[in-house]
């Protein structure tokens, strides 16, 4: 069974990684985002949320 012989594993792993890097690197580097983020001046709501499990009430003593 050839998978039990670990001698060629490093060569197979490194050659596969090198091939994928050579093929995928130009594709990744040439990628341009389709939706560029825009600077929107929307009013930000600064009110905090009130969660029922974080409210401390004196009736639960």
Curated annotation (Swiss-Prot):
It is found in: Mitochondrion membrane. GO terms for biological process: proton motive force-driven ATP synthesis. GO terms for cellular component: mitochondrial membrane; proton-transporting ATP synthase complex. InterPro entries: ATP8_metazoa, ATPase_protein_8. The chain crosses the membrane at residues 10-32. It comes from Chelonia mydas. This is ATP synthase F(0) complex subunit 8. Keywords: ATP synthesis, CF(0), Hydrogen ion transport, Ion transport, Membrane, Mitochondrion, Transmembrane, Transmembrane helix, Transport. Subunit 8, of the mitochondrial membrane ATP synthase complex (F(1)F(0) ATP synthase or Complex V) that produces ATP from ADP in the presence of a proton gradient across the membrane which is generated by electron transport complexes of the respiratory chain. ATP synthase complex consist of a soluble F(1) head domain - the catalytic core - and a membrane F(1) domain - the membrane proton channel. These two domains are linked by a central stalk rotating inside the F(1) region and a stationary peripheral stalk. GO terms for molecular function: proton transmembrane transporter activity. The keyword Transport applies.
